[in-house]
Amino acid sequence: MTHGEELGSDVHQDSIVLTYLEGLLMHQAAGGSGTAINKKSAGHKEEDQNFNLSGSAFPSCQSNGPTVSTQTYQGSGMLHLKKARLLQSSEDWNAAKRKRLSDSIVNLNVKKEALLAGMVDSVPKGKQDSTLLASLLQSFSSRLQTVALSQQIRQSLKEQGYALSHESLKVEKDLRCYGVASSHLKTLLKKSKTKDQKSGPTLPDVTPNLIRDSFVESSHPAVGQSGTKVMSEPLSCAARLQAVASMVEKRASPAASPKPSVACSQLALLLSSEAHLQQYSREHALKTQNAHQVASERLAAMARLQENGQKDVGSSQLSKGVSGHLNGQARALPASKLVANKNNAATFQSPMGVVPSSPKNTSYKNSLERNNLKQAANNSLLLHLLKSQTIPTPMNGHSQNERASSFESSTPTTIDEYSDNNPSFTDDSSGDESSYSNCVPIDLSCKHRIEKPEAERPVSLENLTQSLLNTWDPKIPGVDIKEDQDTSTNSKLNSHQKVTLLQLLLGHKSEETVERNASPQDIHSDGTKFSPQNYTRTSVIESPSTNRTTPVSTPPLYTASQAESPINLSQHSLVIKWNSPPYACSTPASKLTNTAPSHLMDLTKGKESQAEKPAPSEGAQNSATFSASKLLQNLAQCGLQSSGPGEEQRPCKQLLSGNPDKPLGLIDRLNSPLLSNKTNAAEESKAFSSQPAGPEPGLPGCEIENLLERRTVLQLLLGNSSKGKNEKKEKTPARDEAPQEHSERAANEQILMVKIKSEPCDDFQTHNTNLPLNHDAKSAPFLGVTPAIHRSTAALPVSEDFKSEPASPQDFSFSKNGLLSRLLRQNQESYPADEQDKSHRNSELPTLESKNICMVPKKRKLYTEPLENPFKKMKNTAVDTANHHSGPEVLYGSLLHQEELKFSRNELDYKYPAGHSSASDGDHRSWARESKSFNVLKQLLLSENCVRDLSPHRSDSVPDTKKKGHKNNAPGSKPEFGISSLNGLMYSSPQPGSCVTDHRTFSYPGMVKTPLSPPFPEHLGCVGSRPEPGLLNGCSVPGEKGPIKWVIADMDKNEYEKDSPRLTKTNPILYYMLQKGGGNSVTTQETQDKDIWREPASAESLSQVTVKEELLPAAETKASFFNLRSPYNSHMGNNASRPHSTNGEVYGLLGNALTIKKESE
């Protein structure tokens, strides 16, 4: 067996197998320290090497492993003794395997085959294990290094040569009899000397320098390190095989101490995770250090600057940032914050006030801080923050550094800094922090201003300083590094959450960072929509005009107002404009952007919820995920109290207009760093101009501080999921409180829907979205789904059953086509006219009832409905055409039902667009599963609230997509207040993206105008035949759109979903959380329906969602924008459900978007 030959695929396979076997043996040992693992692996590798060198490597391996242990025992006696024990335990465990391996000792390849067949039968692909083991060996090689031992082994091997391999086998057999570690070590020393002498020359032949270096470096590191090196070599494969065989034999041997194997298994587990975590740890360690440095500096500088720099925020803080380099960054950050605060006042007076000071602080402080703060602050702040955030530091540090660097680079120079952002988090961190603080302090000051203008700032700033000291780290990165903000806030505010929620969130955010990259706008919309939800959500709906105007000039503000549908519309274009470039600039920027919106959203959410229920927010913060759901419910209730009546919210809209601007301004500021300081200044000025009205009518400064703190904590605890939940739950109680309003609004919305129908793009697109969702499951079933939806009004339980029935999106299409289709057909046949009447009635009076009762079934029914034959759906649609409510109700039940269903459908579309296309749905789902596996921490974080929904949605992808359809519709419904304007912006903007459903308005021209509808000509004909049920026609169009939308609508719907999350700001997360939980799906449905009710313009919402859907193609054209939306969708509840239930789109589409985004970056 020539080692050179083994260097090829065989060597690689062998190394993989050996790695797997080593890991298997280690785990079989049921224990062992990391040292033990390395001992095992090192022993295995060394033994394998010896085995390669000597035909009978098992004895040699066994003795070699112990020999290494014995020789290393000379160097590190305990380690080698443990290694010997570990090898013995491996003998005990794998005596039979070792015998089998020893049978194939002569033929290393045969032996390798035996190992593969026997020990590695289940792991032919040991690449992962081998990589992990290699990383483990590498990580522990330094620990195990015994240069003298390795040299001795090599010398002995060279001296004795290969002849002792068989003797070593005998000796190893004798060692089995020895049973004593000492005798084993002695005999193994002799054997290993002989083996090493034998394998030494062979190893030098193959890789004399490599093996010698490995052995010289450390006998067992040589075993582990050279094993690692040899892992890529045939020698390592054979030696490792022998070592594995010896491990098996030794585990079977009597004198085995399980502890080493336990340590090895533990190390294997730790290092396997460590292999992944080390990347994060190494990357995030620097990032965390930088982030913590900046955060500590910020906290310190915030305290100083808030006290000292409040009066001289713009100039003195600039000078402070310039003068104090180490403090300069902290100061620059708080100075930027204070400057932002002052500039908030100045922004009210002169928008440019913020821009000049903020850019100055950003650029100048970036240079100074990067030069000085980095070094000094990196040490002290890093140590301090690392100490404070020891557990979450690797993950949180990564996110925080990422955010800090992203923000730093994004604020001074969105593109350049973004470019520097990833490569130099430490360097960018300080600058990022300063520019970051520029925007975020503005945010904080904006919130303060909203609550208290300049007069209150000192108190609010002091309180805010205290709160920021607790929450500033996340808040400062909150602008661009909201994700890290959440993490940082979690780590700082919630140490226990740091370990659990922070790590999960960091893992969750790590993958969601990409998702959020595409979803910061949605997050912003979520945040804006959520935080104003008490007073601003309606306001945002009303302020869409203001926000719409502001977003144009200030994309961040626009993104902020994006929470509301109207802003969303403009935001799509603007987000594409400015979010896309920052995202294109760098993924960290996108992550930061996503983080910032989510952070703001969380902050606004926390503020909103804290205004209503500060204690619940605190509880949610403490209770992390579980509390997140309950807290979100509490927050939803609080939001209900504040924004319970959707109609009330509308009247409040104008009053809240300032408030929405305030959250928008905050969001804008947070996002503005992504754009630029100028944009930030403009947004700030706009936000400030809008915010002064908001803060005074809003909460007092201290209250806002508390709310901000709690919001930050909530954000950290719940992440965006809790945001969605909070808003969604808020909206759910709000809908409950204002069901009559919703019913009235439903009538109004029906009118609005008709209006939007006049806009072919929106309703048509929304319906197309819904239909493509269903169409993805099955175009024909979706056509039947319209009747199914129609029936869902009549047969709500059936829809529930349908929803639960579809286990998987694919199964959904088939199973629904079969059983569900039959049930729906039966229901359709039995309830065609009744459903129309019932739908109409539900839309009128039963609307609330339908909302509450049928809401979930409808939503589920919508899930099921796609299974319905398109013909049946066409039939139902045609039947419903006569009745406007009935028409939409076929798809949605009554219009109110329709709203519910829309909301649910928005949910479904929201989720389903991700799993929108059947083919891409599977792919996306597979991607979602991959990302799910990849995002274990995220899933762990989301598992409680979201996994429940995700698993049903994953299993019931079509129901999920239907939910998403509902969700998407609901998000559209949600921003109903501003949905028409949003639709105007949205579908006009997305029209270029997807002309088919561009104007998928409730106007039947939209139905006629169905570039996507051609996939369902008959369905389109059905739609055309019933132009009155614009929603239904829209849905039919989505079905027709489905085939096209799978191509375009997939992205389109992804964006649409993203928009839906924006529309349903936090509702998507709530959907995500609720849909993740099977029991929550009803709540989700209710909340979705309530969202629809809350924003009765369900048709509008559909239109808006459709427009967003339409925008998706445009977003595809604008990859970064789409990426924004796509990650945002993933990030939002829909993001959560989407990476899981609609991962296909979120990840398939999002993957494309992320790929595009990365490419753009």
From Swiss-Prot:
Residues 34-68, 393-436, 517-559, 604-623, 639-702, 717-747, 829-848, 950-976 are annotated as: Disordered. Acetylation abolishes interaction with CTBP1. Phosphorylation enhances interaction with YWHAH. Acetylation regulates its nuclear translocation and corepressive activity. Residues 411-701 are annotated as: Repression domain 2. A motif (LXXLL motif 1) lies at residues 21-25. A motif (LXXLL motif 7) lies at residues 714-718. A motif (LXXLL motif 9) lies at residues 937-941. The modification Phosphothreonine is found at T207. It is found in: Nucleus. GO terms for molecular function: histone deacetylase binding; nuclear estrogen receptor binding; nuclear glucocorticoid receptor binding; nuclear retinoic acid receptor binding; nuclear retinoid X receptor binding; RNA polymerase II cis-regulatory region sequence-specific DNA binding; signaling receptor binding; transcription coactivator activity. Changing P1068A: Abolishes binding to RAR, RXR and RAR/RXR. Residues 1063-1076 are annotated as: Ligand-dependent nuclear receptor binding. Its main location: nucleus. Residues 78-335 are annotated as: Repression domain 1. Modulates transcriptional repression by nuclear hormone receptors such as NR2C1, thyroid hormone receptor and retinoic acid receptor/RARA. Essential for cumulus expansion and follicle rupture during ovulation. Also controls the balance between fat accumulation and energy expenditure. Positive regulator of the circadian clock gene expression: stimulates transcription of BMAL1, CLOCK and CRY1 by acting as a coactivator for RORA and RORC. Involved in the regulation of ovarian function. Plays a role in renal development. This is Nuclear receptor-interacting protein 1.
